[in-house]
Each structure stands twice: as C-alpha cells, then as structure tokens.
Amino acid sequence: MAELLECRNLTKKFGSKYALDNVSLTLGRGRIVGLLGPNGSGKSTLIKTINGLLTPTQGEVLINGELPGVESKRIISYLPERTYLNDWMKVRDIIEFFADFYDDFSTDKAYEMLERLHIDPKDRLKTLSKGTKEKVQLILVMSREADLYILDEPIGGVDPASRDYILETILTNYNENATLLISTHLITDIEKILDDIIFLKDGKVVVSGSAEAIREEQGCSIDAYFREVFRC
C-alpha cells in the first residue's frame, strides 16, 4: 500500500528564492504530525504544494501514490492560514454549502461543535471576531471524514485561553485512522498531542522523527529543542 503522503525531492522557487529546497518526507496513516518552523520557513508553501495549489519547480507530491488532483481533494480536509469565507453568509448557510459539496461532511458533528464553542449558527460572519471566524473554519474542516487533515496555523489567531479547547476539538473530532498534519510556530501549546515532528528551516527539513524519541535523545521538550535549532 502506498504511503498516505510522500514528497520526493520537492523544490519550489519564486524567482531566484528557494521557498522549498529538496524536501523529501513521508507520512503514514493514523499519526498526528507537527510541521514546525518560524515564519518564512516554507511551511505554508509546502502545505499549498501538497494541496495542489502551487506547482513544484522540481520533484513531486504523491497522495496515496497519485499526484494531487480531484481524487486527492476527496480525501484531504484543508484549513488554510487565512479566512476565505464570505462575510455576508450566515454560519448555518456555510454548513449547508459544505454538506452539499462534500459527501463526507457531517452536519450533526458541525452543529455539535458550534454548540460546544458557543457559536450561534444564525450569526453572519461579518459580526464575528477574527478568532471566532477561525473557529468556524476549523469546525468545517473537522466535520469531514477525511484521510488527511492539513491545518495551517489552527491556533495562531485564537486567544491563549481558547487554545486547549481548540486542540480538544481537533482531537475529539478527527478520524483516528487518518493523519493530521498541523503547521504552527506555537510549539508549547501543541507538542503534547504530536506523534511526529518535522522542523522546516529555510525551506529544508532539518529534523524529523518521533516526538517521543527526539525528547529522549535530546533530553528536553520539543519546544526547547526547537528554540535551540532555530536560535538566532
């Protein structure tokens, strides 16, 4: 059986600048993986390339052994870094739209998460705070039964008091046979849920492996090791 996700010698250039530089990695099934790096390290470029939103300069991405396309979009549930929803829509209208568009979307799960996060489905997006809009986007992503969930900075715009609740929402609502790839620079908040980590620096993978094994080998937390690797 093919790996769920495989990147082979992936390079992406914008002009003469390397956003990704010969990235090779594989993700199996049933793992929670942290894609970790400072701003500008190439995390979002890698995620967009995996989703087929950017074309690599060299190398390739394989999803279940196939290039990104219509079939890969059926099994990937993607949370982009920026809000993409129309402000004039009501939350319930967006849920109905996703339910019509995705066969694997659970309306019941979406409304359950709205209730737990105290979001009124009758509200229009333009009346919601930035953090609440991001919660709505997260709910939409986690209401699908996907094979691969890709979350780009899911807690970046959420206040610290809500972060644990957001992480609990992620953990209790994703398909446990699926893989969860989470991009973030907020290591302290998220390392407790990670099975594996990938450190991305200047578009290159500089560290990858089991989070537990790396903690044992380095004798410190992932956050402390991250600070050491990326020390200015």
Model regions and ranges:
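ABC ATPase "signature
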Residues: 208-209
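Catalytic Walker B motif of ABC-type/P-loop ATPase nucleotide-binding domains
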Residues: 149-153, 158
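ABC-family P-loop ATPase nucleotide-binding domains
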Residues: 81-136
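Conserved ABC transporter NBD signature motif
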Residues: 59-72
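Helix-to-loop junction immediately C-terminal to a conserved catalytic motif
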Residues: 51
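The feature captures the beta-strand-to-loop junction immediately N-terminal to the Walker
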Residues: 33-38
